């Protein structure tokens, strides 16, 4: 057990502690010679488009953590609005978090699961001469995908449609092209067939994270943030 090993090496762990509320940053600065901030990026990227305030649209982590607690043995019930059972689920985002949402939705008994990705579909095999030493760009299919999911690439979500609850999404097919400076830019495709509407009862936003949560820890530590809110 890695934690037990670290304890034997002299590391002490204090769980369920929120810096700025349970312990002040001033106390840490006074009691310790050095402080390492390893909080990660916790603020999820939002999709602020018309209809975002409809019910049934959630950040991926709010959906996944509830299931994780059940898997750990916690006796809790998932609220109906967070359950994928018998629902048409749409996952926006093509990364690992999106893959976790697919697997969890299938296990909860989703009626259908569709994953949307704004980027182009990657090649089946990477071009090692072009990608090395960077992370290779190639199509990745997880065990969650193999369990069942529709995967759509090069689409941008433009509207969440519905009355009180989300009922469908309006999508626009997009194209990636190089501009005069040689940078890849995104443009909406034209024509009637470029716009698509998909049914949705539950939408999970899995588009990555933008920066640390700007709580009392960040403020009291006095660290500088850039224009995007990153350390």
Predicted regions and their residues:
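Short gly/pro/ser/thr-enriched loop/turn and capping motifs at secondary-structure boundaries
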Residues: 43-45, 64-66, 121-125
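Active-site rim loops that border cofactor/substrate pockets in soluble metabolic enzymes
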Residues: 139, 145, 169-191
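Rossmann-like dinucleotide-binding cores of NAD(P)H-dependent redox enzymes
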Residues: 1-4, 13, 102-159
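Phosphate-coordination loops involved in phosphoryl transfer and adenosine-cofactor binding
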Residues: 16, 85-88, 154
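Feature captures the FAD/FMN-dependent oxidoreductase FAD-binding
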Residues: 3-50, 158-180, 200-204, 209-217
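FAD-site-proximal beta/loop scaffold in flavoenzymes
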Residues: 53-86, 178-231
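Rossmann-like NAD(P)H-binding beta-loop-alpha module
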Residues: 74-110
């Amino acid at each position: 057990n890695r934690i037990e090993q670290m304890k034997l090496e002299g590391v002490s762990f204090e769980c369920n502690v929120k810096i700025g509320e349970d312990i002040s940053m001033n106390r840490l600065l006074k009691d310790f010679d050095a402080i390492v901030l390893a909080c990660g990026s916790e603020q999820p990227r939002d999709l602020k488009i018309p209809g975002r305030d409809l019910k049934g649209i959630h950040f991926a982590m709010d959906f996944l953590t509830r299931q994780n607690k059940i898997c750990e043995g916690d006796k809790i019930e998932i609220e109906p609005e967070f359950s994928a059972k018998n629902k048409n689920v749409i996952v926006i985002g093509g990364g690992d978090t999106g893959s976790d949402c697919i697997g969890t939705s299938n296990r909860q008994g989703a009626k259908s699961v569709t994953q949307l990705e704004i980027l182009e579909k990657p090649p089946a095999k990477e071009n090692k001469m072009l990608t090395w030493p960077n992370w290779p760009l190639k199509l990745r299919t997880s065990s969650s995908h193999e369990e069942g999911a529709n995967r759509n690439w090069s689409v941008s979500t433009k509207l969440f449609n519905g009355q009180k609850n989300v009922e469908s999404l309006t999508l626009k097919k997009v194209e990636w092209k190089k501009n005069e400076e040689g940078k890849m830019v995104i443009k909406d495709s034209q024509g009637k067939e470029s716009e698509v509407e998909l049914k949705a009862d539950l939408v999970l936003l899995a588009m990555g994270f933008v920066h640390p949560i700007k709580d009392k820890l960040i403020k009291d530590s006095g660290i500088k943030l850039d224009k995007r809110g990153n350390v």
